[in-house]
Amino acid sequence: MGTLQEKVRRFQKKTITELRDRQNADGSWTFCFEGPIMTNSFFILLLTSLDEGENEKELISSLAAGIHAKQQPDGTFINYPDETRGNLTATVQGYVGMLASGCFHRTEPHMKKAEQFIISHGGLRHVHFMTKWMLAANGLYPWPALYLPLSLMALPPTLPIHFYQFSSYARIHFAPMAVTLNQRFVLINRNISSLHHLDPHMTKNPFTWLRSDAFEERDLTSILLHWKRVFHAPFAFQQLGLQTAKTYMLDRIEKDGTLYSYASATIYMVYSLLSLGVSRYSPIIRRAITGIKSLVTKCNGIPYLENSTSTVWDTALISYALQKNGVTETDGSVTKAADFLLERQHTKIADWSVKNPNSVPGGWGFSNINTNNPDCDDTTAVLKAIPRNHSPAAWERGVSWLLSMQNNDGGFSAFEKNVNHPLIRLLPLESAEDAAVDPSTADLTGRVLHFLGEKVGFTEKHQHIQRAVKWLFEHQEQNGSWYGRWGVCYIYGTWAALTGMHACGVDRKHPGIQKALRWLKSIQNDDGSWGESCKSAEIKTYVPLHRGTIVQTAWALDALLTYENSEHPSVVKGMQYLTDSSSHSADSLAYPAGIGLPKQFYIRYHSYPYVFSLLAVGKYLDSIEKETANET
């Protein structure tokens, strides 16, 4: 019994106790799902444009205060701590949200600083198109001289190009955004008369809405002309597109009134329905507003509008982590969590079935009330959390659905199957390659492999495993790492790939495994920690943070401990850092570890320091026990 082992056991016991104490009566765990200030800003704009200012004064004031609390001393806003020069889109969002609230005024020093930053960076021209859309819907930016091809929505999925070639995330936002844009709808915000002081040269030029980093303007013109030829349609067909878009949205409203349970999509939907003549006082609009309001919470005391809850995800991860640290399957915490999760298994045919028509529903979604949008990541997490014998039929149905979602290339993606059309990837919109398609990713593929190996008992001999492992090695980076799409970033992808392949029996002597282990060890900080910048997701190259984070250190340790023993120097140093109370500073805990959309939406999962630290210390202690047993 060394001092480090004793320290780890104390840490383990403390974390388990904290998690037990935080479990809700219904078996779930609730932690903040904290993203950018965009949601606060957009909801303030919507409420004030709907003349809800007097009725919702307290809510608007708190959301504005939440924005102001995150403003930097120089007046800018940033999406992650080491984005040192300020983020233009985030600063516009913050500035406009505060101004629209009526709680802050242009003459205040912090507002003047934000103005100066925006003006010095070219005004509004280079703001992300989704924020431009929000400004235009509120009469603060001109709609572009461009109509989006809503006729696309009316095309049958049997054609080579159709609406379901876009990712579910893109579709659920594209539909309301396209309707509102094509209707040239404006809901005047009475709290902001104009933003011309930020940009006197606003233009209807559609090229200012498009990505220009990869194309010359002449190339953009040719691409747009190509899309126009593909989707050129008579007026009647365009009207059919409008109606199809409306039906598409209405059919995907959750019981709380939100669209797909996303605050962002719901806000866009409200504008689009208003543009189609739906009354602002109609039940559907009122339920949507109420649903968005239900997502307002406090993250570390700061008012924040979550884009959705993360209840299913958090509950599954925590229950599994507890079980990996000695909490039995029959323990009340585990059984209550299992019952909560079982109630949220999906039972209806939804959009995922377009590309996967022969599978029976059985997956799980991310949020507390999601019934439309299951995903492979949540499904694997839930199936690892629910003991197999707790509900065998539901468990097997989940496994069957998950296996049916394997892509033709052998990998797994987040929401849907085989949604990676090359023409969609080439759309000249910022982040199209990250948001418009849903390709196989190393993190999803690795996490599915981990579940199939650990819980289902699949090995390298199984066809599903062979195809997935082949995909992973084909997509390994030259330096030995893997890129993770939904977490930051190369540490995340490498952790998922290594733990997944180990669970299925891939030998440590494999050159790809050796290369990955060498890479992980090479990026460890001198204090034993690991840390990676969100910048990695933006330039698709590993960028060190030059300081440690608790979550990324836990991922790296978990990965190393799959192939190395507990006495390996990297493991010892890392475990000392992870379990040292001084390491758990605000900076090391608060750094975003999740990615919704690179450059725009980074996520701080408040549950992650608990979950992944616990998994790492549990594996460390298991490793010691196995090594001791082997010695005797």
UniProtKB/Swiss-Prot annotation:
Annotated GO MF terms: intramolecular transferase activity; lyase activity
The keyword Transit peptide is annotated on this UniProt entry: no
Active site positions: 377 (proton donor)
Record note on disruption phenotype: No effect on biofilm formation.
Entry-linked InterPro entries: SQ_cyclase_C, SQ_cyclase_N, Squalene_cyclase, Terpenoid_cyclase/PrenylTrfase
Coarse class of the protein's main subcellular location: membrane
Gene3D superfamilies xrefs: 1.50.10.20
Topology versus the membrane: Peripheral membrane protein
Subcellular location: Cell membrane
Record's protein name: Sporulenol synthase
